[in-house]
Curated annotation (Swiss-Prot):
Keywords from the UniProt entry: Chromosome, Phosphoprotein
Official protein name in the record: Replication termination factor 2
Organism: Rattus norvegicus
Pfam families cross-referenced by the UniProt entry: Rtf2
Modification comment: Undergoes proteasomal degradation, via DDI1 and DDI2. Removal from stalled replisomes and degradation are required for genome stability.
One GO process term, biological-process aspect: regulation of DNA stability
Principal place of residence: nucleus
Compartments it resides in: Chromosome
GO cellular component terms listed in the entry, alphabetical order: nucleus; replication fork
Biased composition, class Basic and acidic residues, residue ranges: 226-240
Region named Disordered: 192-306
């Protein structure tokens, strides 16, 4: 049986079976992971940050995502674990001197090498193109190849000298097993931080209660001191309270205050043990006193009066 024109159809043209799964080009996948932002799908440009699962982002895209409070904001696997800017780390990348960028093939007549990367490992010199495993330190943000960390075993960063632990090493764009391990570490780290916050709160409450108890214990002593002061007033206050009564008794009915007696304040020089020459200076001495005959009359007799 044939069709018009004498052609004979084959079985696969008539019977439709299940579609084959399309295979993703590995080179294209690596280029997308290492050269484009996971959130905005734009070309990576500095400052570049990485999350706790090892995915690469543009810092501007992460900030815009966190500031966006609208209900239409897309929440996917790439952003569900990012709750604040503290959940990402800014990377310290080393530039590749052989990288020419878009300037190398402006005419389109040359082969575009997709394996050429913008950044390299500062220790070994491997290019960060996805062919080699790279990781970064969460404490300082320095990026190295996994080979460099294995060959040069140290507990200090090779670039800045910061101390780190094994938990601080995060693999960039790792496999599914790597992502699951990093996710488990992230959850443990966040749970530990919550427990530390809860333990700090009771300590502050206990310190506040201790301060309150100390203030309460200091209160009765002050009250007792106040009662003793009221019961036993200062004798100086007694004298000062008695003084106005005396002045009031010396005062007249019109409200004027009388002068206090000054006899007690006066002091005679005759009672002192000084010499007679010293005593003769003062008017209280006997030599300074005159009789009525020697004293002058208040009316002066002069030649002008006659």
């Amino acid at each position: 049986m044939g069709c018009d024109g004498g052609t004979i159809p084959k079985r696969h043209e008539l019977v439709k079976g299940p579609k084959k799964v399309e295979k993703v080009d590995k080179d294209a996948e690596l280029v997308a992971q290492w050269n484009y932002c996971t959130l905005s799908q734009e070309v990576l440009r500095r400052p570049i940050v990485a999350c706790e699962l090892g995915r690469l982002y543009n810092k501007d895209a992460v900030i815009e995502f966190l500031l966006d409070k609208s209900a239409e904001k897309a929440l996917g696997k790439a952003t569900s674990h990012i709750r604040s800017i503290k959940n990402v780390t800014e990377l310290k990348l080393s530039d590749n001197p052989a990288w020419e960028g878009d300037k190398g093939n402006t005419k389109g007549d040359k082969h575009d090498d997709l394996q050429r990367a913008r950044f390299i490992c500062p220790v070994v010199g491997l290019e960060m193109n996805g062919r080699h495993r790279f990781c970064f330190l969460r404490c300082c943000g320095c990026v190295f190849s996994e080979r460099a960390l294995k060959e040069i075993k140290a507990e200090v960063c090779h670039t800045c000298g910061a101390a780190f632990q094994e938990e601080d090493i995060i693999v960039l764009n790792g496999t599914k097993e790597d992502v699951e391990m990093l996710k488990r570490r992230m959850e443990e780290r966040r749970l530990r931080a919550k427990l530390e916050k809860k333990t700090k709160k009771p300590k502050t409450a206990e310190s506040a209660s201790k301060l309150g108890i100390s203030q309460d214990s200091a209160g009765p002593s002050k009250a007792k001191a106040g009662k003793s002061e009221e019961a036993d007033p200062d004798p100086r206050e007694k004298k000062s309270s008695l003084a106005p009564r005396g002045t009031a008794s010396n005062g007249s009915a019109s409200g004027k205050v009388g002068k206090p007696p000054c006899g007690a304040l006066k002091r005679s020089i005759a009672d002192s043990e000084e010499s007679e020459t010293y005593k003769s200076i003062f008017t209280s001495h006997s030599s300074a006193k005159r009789s009525k005959e020697e004293s002058a009359h208040w009316v002066t007799h002069t030649s002008y009066c006659f």
